[in-house]
Amino acid sequence: MNIDKFTAHAKSVIASSQLLAAKNDHQQILPLHLLSSLLSEETGIIQTLINNTGGNINLLKDQVQLELNKIPKVQVEGGGQVYSSAEALKVLEKASSIAKDNGDSFVTIERIFEALTYDNTIAGKILTNNGINNKKIATAILQFRKGKKADTESAENSYDALKKYGRDVTELAESGKLDPIIGRDEEIRRTVQVLSRRMKNNPVLIGEPGVGKTAIIEGLAQRIFSKDVPESLINCRIIELDMGALIAGAKYRGEFEERLKAVLSEIKESSGEIILFIDELHLLVGTGKTDGAMDASNLLKPMLARGELHCIGATTLDEYRKYIEKDAALARRFQPVYVSEPTVEDTISILRGIKEKYELHHAVRISDSAIVAAATLSNRYITDRYLPDKAIDLIDEACSRMKIELSSKPEELDELDRRIIQIKIELAALKKENDEHSKKKIEHLTTALEKLESQSYDMGAKWQAEKSKLQQTQKLKEELDRSRNELERAERDANLAKASELKYGIIPEIMKKLQEAESMDNKGLLKEIVSESDIASIISRITGIPIDTMLSSERERLLVMEQKLRESVIGQDKAIKGVSDAVRRSRAGIQDINRPLGSFLFLGPTGVGKTELTKALAGFLFDDRNAILRIDMSEYMEKHAISRLIGAPPGYIGYDQGGVLTEAVRRRPYQVILFDEVEKAHPDIFNIMLQILDEGRLTDSQGITVDFKNTIIVLTSNLGAEILVNQKEDEDTYKVKDEVMEYVKAVFKPEFLNRLDEIILFHRLNRNNIHDIVKIQLESLKKILLAQNIILEFDESALNYLAEKGYDPSFGARPLKRLIQREIQNNLAKMILAGEISSGKTVKINSKDKELKVTMS
């Protein structure tokens, strides 16, 4: 007997029988040990053979274990060596003989099992007593192998390969596990046309990720199941190839190719009744490729060309170009079927079609307004993904969120229960006190507790009743779904009696009960309908763009936005109004959706509040003054520095890192972007800003389109500042606008200026403005000191002194900050370090004899 002529699985069975004998302290390997190992093998081949011969594997296992327990145990010091008995060797010799007689090059596990039926020991008797004999097993092996010979060391892997390495999509359609497919008739028709060709009948579905390529295959499977296809495809089955399972565990060279060949030969033998579906078709190119080995695509090519293999592929445009088109021999064997992204209207139809499946899964109801919102809002705000995938994700997540809310305690009831616990803790503490005040407090809290417990009990009972009603509705929906599947099956099997009973009796009755349950007033604690606002809320969480329903407090806040901004920015009312109007337009949803929310060029001398207004705007929108993307344009004075904004071109360092501007906006699409000191940048930088301002988009160095439609763009500049500085104090700034614009037009091209929403002039600050700014600066200092528990007080004389001394029409408010540092903060720092000012003290600032006094009280 040559052990090398046994397959890897057969060797594994012999080795495990040896381990079993050693574990049980048996002196030698008996046929019983071989039978026990065969009954426990992992491939499932032996179990299938036993089932096909009418045996029961669990009964066999129990009987074998009983007999193993009867074998005498002999313990040898040091473990000893376990040898094969003459009977076991005879079984293996018989297996080799049977394999040879049947034309097998290798001995497989089923041949060892067949040899055991010839055994005269207890193992053979157990099989005979269970009705398993050599004739039955030989017939079962013949049927199971379907004429295949064991000619490789891993022959067992090639049995029933399609079942191991594939998924029957037609079977899923039959059992009703696939979502209904709406539309896509043209793509399905084109796929059927290609499949019906004589040669090269292999379509490949090409489209962006998430447009529904796999759904088209599921739609075709449903049509095959319902016989809504040409005669040539009526008896076909679609099997999806699992490339992961095919590759997994292929340790030895040639094992992967052997598995794939087994799959292909099964398809070939089916005489065109099996259509192979390969999702992510590009994985074929290079899969299994090692030194001197062929990759999967080369194994497929001959069969594809001859029309022996019906194959449908699916891949994305990028991957098709990158992998398939490079292999011209493979590309010509496939016929491309392009799958475009559906329109918003088509997406709404698709969502309406699959709505019932999601309602059933999540046990909630989806309103039609939620479906329309999911399609329209995802199309507008989620720009880096494709319909219908992104819209379906929104519906799914909104339903999931509502399902979690339904299964948890309502907020009102939760608050009541927390209040009850709080009162009980207070009562427990007060009962330890004996004073009159505590007794009164106990009496008061006891009354409140009784009232709250009564409310909690009533609300809890109401919640449980509502929950029970929802569960009842869910059961009815599940029953209706089951009945519809049964009706389809009955109609297909021509079981007219059952079909009529379901169609005219059971289904109408369930629908009536369901309508009654859903029509009952449900204005209680639980909300079970997914609405438009739920979808908007999910998008807001994903993108950070506030499109969910505005609270009344936010509406009021937006109407008084100018007042809020004036608290930080003094004396620039026209600029504040222009920015406020842009924000209100965007939050009201009436701005041009293809442009940024607002684009402004702020012109004015230094220190008048251009950058400060941008920070105040960020503070108003995001409650964080630093939530702005600030790009200092003085860093982009050289032409080559421009590429930093959108990313370095291919071949340059940093190509894979993305651009400063594009990456920041991709990660946070709703923000204020400040291009500071814009006139200092290289003129070419404005060319890339043209499409941002006009179309609200920009393509980075890697070809990714970044959406700027939810940004506010602010550009600041000092152009024409000398004109504004030399202007009379009370003169209207807009009288000199034409002169300032001459400077602006000399630097910026007309096509750039024409794309801005507004060019806003900041006038120079007058003495009254400086007085107000002093107050803001001192209030800011007051907050800083308050954090150290030091109180700061100042009077009007201090304000007047600082305003007079810090006023400089050429430099705006910036000298004022330096003055406060010099006159106040420096003195305070010395006093704190010297220990003169400590926590809890009050510091007073006033002016006397044209000097600023800092005193402590």
Curated annotation (Swiss-Prot):
Protein keywords: ATP-binding, Chaperone, Coiled coil, Cytoplasm, Nucleotide-binding, Repeat, Stress response
Gene giving rise to this polypeptide: clpB
Summary of the function given for this chain in its UniProt record: Part of a stress-induced multi-chaperone system, it is involved in the recovery of the cell from heat-induced damage, in cooperation with DnaK, DnaJ and GrpE. Acts before DnaK, in the processing of protein aggregates. Protein binding stimulates the ATPase activity; ATP hydrolysis unfolds the denatured protein aggregates, which probably helps expose new hydrophobic binding sites on the surface of ClpB-bound aggregates, contributing to the solubilization and refolding of denatured protein aggregates by DnaK.
Protein name: Chaperone protein ClpB
Keyword Transcription on entry: no
GO biological process: cellular response to heat; protein refolding
Subcellular location: Cytoplasm
Broad class of the protein's primary localization: cytoplasm
Superkingdom of the source species: Bacteria
Binding site for ATP 2: G604, P605, T606, G607, V608, G609, K610, T611
Record-linked NCBIfam families: chaperone_ClpB (TIGR03346)
Residues bound to ATP 1: G207, E208, P209, G210, V211, G212, K213, T214
Subunit structure: Homohexamer. The oligomerization is ATP-dependent.
InterPro entries (alphabetical): AAA+_ATPase (IPR003593), ATPase_AAA_core (IPR003959), Chaperonin_ClpB (IPR017730), Clp_ATPase_C (IPR019489), Clp_N_dom_sf (IPR036628), Clp_R_dom (IPR004176), ClpA/B (IPR001270), ClpA/B_CS1 (IPR018368)
Keyword Chaperone: yes
Pfam families, alphabetized: AAA (PF00004), AAA_2 (PF07724), AAA_lid_9 (PF17871), Clp_N (PF02861), ClpB_D2-small (PF10431)
One GO location term (cellular component): cytoplasm
NBD1, as annotated region: 160-341
Region Repeat 2: start-end pairs: 84-147
Family according to the record: Belongs to the ClpA/ClpB family.
Coiled coil (UniProt feature): 392-523
